[in-house]
Swiss-Prot record:
One of its GO terms (biological process) is response to hydroperoxide. Belongs to the UPF0246 family. PANTHER family: PEROXIDE STRESS RESISTANCE PROTEIN YAAA, PEROXIDE STRESS RESPONSE PROTEIN YAAA. One of its GO terms (cellular component) is cytosol. It comes from the Bacteria. This is UPF0246 protein SO_3540. InterPro entries: YaaA (IPR005583).
Length: 257
């Protein structure tokens, strides 16, 4: 069972990681191509392109300028410990045991605009480059065209290594658009999380992001290996709804918070 998640805009490079064990991203050559494009952008360009404040644009212009492919554990951090935000709050990587971290490294993949597809222990430098960014590059007019079939092929390789052919999509639409589902060699399952509000169950972004992280952690903790095992997810008030579920979209509900 392979789990796909999105990265986070919020980063933590201050707190030391739980382990010094690390790996190198598979697509650093492509990352460097993108960095070289980004290094040509002024802070004003970045503010317009990414729709961010001048201060955030300036920070990321500096990050692009300082980025080098030969970074190490001394000035970088493993992705699973560097990313913060709602999904990662739900996943709570800081409480993983060594055995759980090993399973996470095997089963979890993080889609990234800059790095393509990350394993949890892959080292990253601070960056901001969302997958939906319309960054013109030598391969096209955006990052979806830049990555092409590369990430789909990488996911296929990773799911083949798992052996059961199940892909759990816990990524956002923006990031999963970098994958081409019709070329995936496996059963694609996209869980849906709905909270009760104003008289109906609906997807509430903040809660859904956290729930995706909690489900990813549940799969690791419980060593879930089947769709039926996934349906047993009952964390933080969520429960499986057979009535609202579709064959490849198991739906989980939660009452008003």
């Amino acid at each position: 069972m392979l789990i796909l998640v999105s990265p986070a805009k919020t980063l933590d490079f201050e707190q030391p990681p739980l382990t010094q064990i690390h790996t190198r991203p598979d697509f650093l050559a492509q990352s460097q191509e993108l960095i070289q494009v980004c290094q040509q952008l002024t802070p004003s360009d970045i503010a317009t392109l990414m729709k961010v404040s001048d201060s955030i644009a300036g920070l990321n212009a500096a990050r692009f300028g300082e980025w080098k492919p030969d970074y190490s554990i001394d000035n970088a951090k493993q992705a699973i410990f560097a990313f913060r935000g709602d999904v990662y709050t739900g996943f709570d990587a800081d409480t993983l045991t060594a055995a759980q971290l090993e399973r996470t490294q095997s089963q979890l993949r993080i889609l990234s605009g800059l790095y393509g597809l990350l394993r949890p222990l892959d080292l990253i430098l601070p960056y901001r480059l969302e997958m939906g960014t319309a960054l013109t590059n030598q391969k096209g007019k955006n990052l979806y065209e830049f990555w092409g079939n590369t990430l789909t092929d990488a996911v296929n390789s990773a799911v083949a290594a798992q052996g059961d052919g199940i892909i759990i999509n816990l990524a956002s639409n923006e990031y999963f658009k970098a994958i081409k589902p019709k070329f995936l060699n496996g059963q694609l399952i996209t869980p849906v999380f709905k909270d009760f509000k104003n008289g109906q169950y609906k997807v509430i972004s903040f809660f859904a992001k956290r729930a995706r992280g909690m489900m990813a952690r549940y799969i690791i903790d419980q060593q879930v290996s089947s769709i039926d095992g996934l349906k047993a997810f009952e964390v933080d008030g969520y429960y499986y709804s057979e009535e609202l579920s579709k064959p490849n979209e198991p739906t989980f509900l939660r009452e008003a918070q």
